[in-house]
C-alpha cells in the first residue's frame, strides 16, 4: 500500500525533472550556436558584413513565421509532445547541415528553415509544461520560473563552451555537439514527457479572464513592451564589446566577464521575481525591470572602470531576470485558452527585438556614435513603460 501511495509522486517528480532537462538541453543547443554564428559566417563561409546581417535578419523573420504557424496548429489540434520531438529531429538535421555544408545560400534557405523548426521546441516545451502543471495542480509560476532558469544556466555554460569547441577544435565539432544535445533532448521527450491531447479541456488554475477585446488589446501592447525591451537589450549586446574596447579602451576579456556575471545573477533574480509575482503583480515587476534597464544603460555611459562595469550588471540581471521569467507568464495569462500561441508570441518578441536592433544599429553608429545607441535603448524602454501602463494587471 505504501508503494502505491508514493508512485504518483515519483512519477510527477520524474516528469518535472524531465521538463527541467529538456529546458536545459534546448538552451544548451541554442547557446552553442548563436554566440559564434557571426564568426562562423565570416570565417568559414567568407560572408561579407552585409551578408552576415542579412542572415540574422532572415533567420529572425523565418523563425517568427514558422513558430507562429506551429503555435496555431498546436493550440487547435495534435499532441505537443510529438511536435517537440519533431522539432528536436529538425534540430539534429540543422546542426548536421551546418557542420558539413559551407554554402551560404544553402544554409540561408534550408539551414535557416530547419533551425526555425528546431527553435520552436523551446516555446512548445514551455506550453506543454504549463498545461501539465495546470492539470496536476502544480504551482505554475515557480515551475515555469525554474524552467526558464535552466535556459539562463545553459547560457552561462554554453557560450564559453561554444568558443572552446569552435576555436580549440573546429566548428564541425561544435555543431555536432549541439546535434548530440538535440538527440538526448529528443530521447527524454519521447520517454518521459506527458502526452496531453488538445481535445481534452484543460483545468487551469484560477486566472482573471478579461473580455476578449480587452485581452487582444493588452496582448498587442504587451508584445510592443517586450519587443522594445528585447530591442534595447540587443542593442546593448551588439555594441557593448565595441564600446568597451574602442570607446573605453578596456580589455576584451571584460566583455566576457560582464556577460557571464549578468547571466549568473539573472537566475536568482528570476526566481525572486517568480516568488513575489502573486504579491505585487506582473505589471509592477515589469515596471521594475524597465526602470532597472534605464538606470543600467545610463550608468554604463558614465562608468569608466572595469569594477564599476561589473557592479552594474546587477541592474542588467534584474532587467533580464524579470523580462525572461515574468514576460512569458504575462502572455500566457492573457491568452489562457491558447497557451502555445502565447508562449510563441513571447518568444517572437525576442526575434522582433533582434530585427529592430539590427536595423538601426549600423545607421546610428555611422551617423552618431555608440553613446547614441545607449540613449536610443533608454528611449525604447520609455516606449515600453508607456505601453505597460495601459495593460491591466492580472
UniProtKB/Swiss-Prot annotation:
The keyword Transmembrane helix applies. Residues 1-10, 71-80, 126-150, 194-224, 275-283, 332-370 are periplasmic. GO terms for molecular function: carbohydrate:proton symporter activity. Its main location: membrane. It is found in: Cell inner membrane. It is a multi-pass membrane protein. One of its GO terms (cellular component) is plasma membrane. Keywords: Cell inner membrane, Cell membrane, Membrane, Sugar transport, Transmembrane, Transmembrane helix, Transport. Involved in the efflux of sugars. The physiological role may be the detoxification of non-metabolizable sugar analogs. This is Sugar efflux transporter C. Gene3D superfamilies: MFS general substrate transporter like domains (1.20.1250.20). Belongs to the major facilitator superfamily. Set transporter family. It comes from the Bacteria. The keyword Transmembrane applies. CDD domains: MFS_Set. Residues 32-49, 102-104, 172, 246-253, 305-310, 392-394 are cytoplasmic. The chain crosses the membrane at residues 11-31, 50-70, 81-101, 105-125, 151-171, 173-193, 225-245, 254-274, 284-304, 311-331, 371-391. GO terms for biological process: cellular response to glucose-phosphate stress; D-glucose transmembrane transport; lactose transport.
Amino acid at each position: 500500500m505504501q508503494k502505491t501511495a508514493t508512485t504518483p509522486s515519483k512519477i510527477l517528480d520524474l516528469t518535472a525533472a524531465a521538463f527541467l532537462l529538456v529546458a536545459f538541453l534546448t538552451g544548451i543547443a541554442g547557446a552553442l550556436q548563436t554566440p559564434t554564428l557571426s564568426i562562423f559566417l565570416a570565417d568559414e563561409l567568407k560572408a561579407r558584413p552585409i551578408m552576415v546581417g542579412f542572415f540574422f535578419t532572415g533567420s529572425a523573420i523565418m523563425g517568427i513565421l514558422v513558430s507562429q504557424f506551429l503555435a496555431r496548429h498546436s493550440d487547435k489540434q495534435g499532441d505537443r509532445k510529438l511536435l517537440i520531438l519533431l522539432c528536436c529531429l529538425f534540430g539534429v538535421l540543422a546542426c548536421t547541415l551546418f557542420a558539413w555544408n559551407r554554402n551560404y545560400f544553402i544554409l540561408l534557405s534550408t539551414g535557416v528553415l530547419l533551425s526555425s523548426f528546431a527553435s520552436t521546441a523551446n516555446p512548445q516545451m514551455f506550453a506543454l509544461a504549463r498545461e501539465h502543471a495546470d492539470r496536476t495542480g502544480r504551482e505554475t509560476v515557480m515551475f515555469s520560473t525554474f524552467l526558464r532558469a535552466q535556459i539562463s544556466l545553459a547560457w552561462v555554460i554554453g557560450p564559453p563552451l561554444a568558443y572552446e569547441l569552435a576555436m580549440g577544435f573546429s566548428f564541425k565539432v561544435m555543431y555536432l555537439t549541439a546535434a548530440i544535445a538535440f538527440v538526448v533532448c529528443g530521447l527524454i521527450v519521447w520517454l518521459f514527457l506527458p502526452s496531453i491531447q488538445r481535445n481534452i479541456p484543460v483545468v487551469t488554475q484560477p486566472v482573471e479572464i478579461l473580455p476578449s477585446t480587452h485581452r487582444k488589446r493588452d496582448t498587442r501592447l504587451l508584445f510592443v513592451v517586450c519587443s522594445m525591451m528585447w530591442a534595447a537589450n540587443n542593442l546593448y549586446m551588439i555594441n557593448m564589446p565595441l564600446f568597451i574596447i574602442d570607446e573605453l579602451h578596456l580589455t576584451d576579456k571584460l566583455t566576457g566577464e560582464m556577460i557571464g556575471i549578468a547571466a549568473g545573477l539573472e537566475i536568482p533574480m528570476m526566481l525572486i521575481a517568480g516568488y513575489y509575482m502573486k504579491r505585487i503583480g506582473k505589471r509592477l515587476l515589469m515596471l521594475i525591470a524597465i526602470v532597472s534597464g534605464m538606470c543600467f544603460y545610463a550608468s554604463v555611459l558614465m562608468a569608466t572602470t572595469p569594477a564599476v562595469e561589473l557592479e552594474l550588471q546587477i541592474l542588467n540581471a534584474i532587467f533580464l531576470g524579470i523580462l525572461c521569467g515574468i514576460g512569458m507568464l504575462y502572455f500566457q495569462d492573457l491568452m489562457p485558452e491558447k497557451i502555445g500561441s502565447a508562449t510563441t508570441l513571447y518568444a517572437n518578441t525576442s526575434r522582433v527585438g533582434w530585427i529592430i536592433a539590427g536595423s538601426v544599429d549600423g545607421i546610428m553608429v555611422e551617423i552618431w556614435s555608440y553613446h547614441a545607441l545607449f540613449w536610443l535603448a533608454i528611449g525604447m524602454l520609455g516606449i515600453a513603460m508607456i505601453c505597460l501602463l495601459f495593460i491591466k494587471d492580472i
